[in-house]
Regions:
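Sec-dependent bacterial lipoprotein signal peptides
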Residues: 1-19
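A structural "domain/chain start" motif
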Residues: 18-79, 178-186
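Surface-exposed short loop/turn segments
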Residues: 21-31, 88, 92-145, 152, ...
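Structural recognition of the beta-strand scaffold that forms the well-ordered cores
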Residues: 56, 147-148
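Short, histidine-centered active-site or binding-site loop motifs used for metal coordination
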Residues: 59-62, 151-155
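Sec/Tat-exported extracytoplasmic proteins
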Residues: 64, 77-92, 114, 170, ...
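Soluble non-cytosolic domains of exported or imported proteins
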Residues: 68-79, 132, 157-169
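Compositionally biased, intrinsically disordered linkers/stalks adjacent to structured regions
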Residues: 153, 159-186
Length: 186
């Protein structure tokens, strides 16, 4: 009797774990990559970026990673950050490269990258692909660095993978940082 109860409990535990993995994969398959940020040098309060009407995004520098970051990733991240900042509707102008006069410039360099790719990820094992960058938010009028942050995009889905998803995750992280310090919407 005790053995049957133990087997039933173990079977329930194994089955429940699998259901949780499937549920998580379904969720991340819908939501895509996630982004997070950590401020190394704070931008200031919740209205610190309100006075800037425009923002420009430089292509992030892959050279610190000594060839580990695919060259195409710099352009994908730049485009993803621009798209996410356009979504915020907080700036009258969002551009690749230099912003309009009196705007903000977001520039960065890649500092960590793991493409993942393990087939074991589909069943809950292995490392999730991630891409991290150190960014600076610069006042172009004074060329002063207003803040520094670490931004990371992580792909937790076994279905939606690849460099485009990682770039989108980094874009979400930058968007979150800007939304934390900008209250006005154009």
């Amino acid at each position: 009797m005790k053995r049957a109860l133990l087997v039933a409990m173990l079977l329930a535990a194994v089955t429940a774990t699998g259901c949780g993995t499937v549920a998580k994969q379904g969720y991340y398959g819908v939501t895509g990559a996630s982004g997070r940020y950590y401020e190394v040098k704070s931008l200031g309060g919740t209205t610190a970026l309100d006075r800037y009407p425009s923002v420009g995004v430089e292509a992030f520098d892959p050279s610190p990673m000594l060839g580990a970051v695919p060259p195409s990733l710099a352009g994908l991240v730049q485009a993803a950050v621009v798209n996410k900042l356009v979504e915020t509707k907080m700036f009258s102008s969002v551009a690749k490269g230099a912003p309009a006069a009196g705007g903000l410039l977001i520039r960065g360099k890649f500092v960590d990258f793991d493409p993942g790719g393990s087939a074991l990820r589909a069943v809950g094992f292995g490392v999730n692909p991630f891409l991290s960058a150190q960014i600076e938010v610069v006042d172009t009028g004074s060329n002063r660095v207003l803040g520094i942050a670490m931004v990371t995009g992580t792909v937790q889905s076994a279905v939606r993978t690849g460099t485009t998803e990682l770039a989108d995750g980094v874009g979400k992280a930058v968007k979150g940082l800007v939304e934390q310090h900008h209250t006005e919407r154009d």
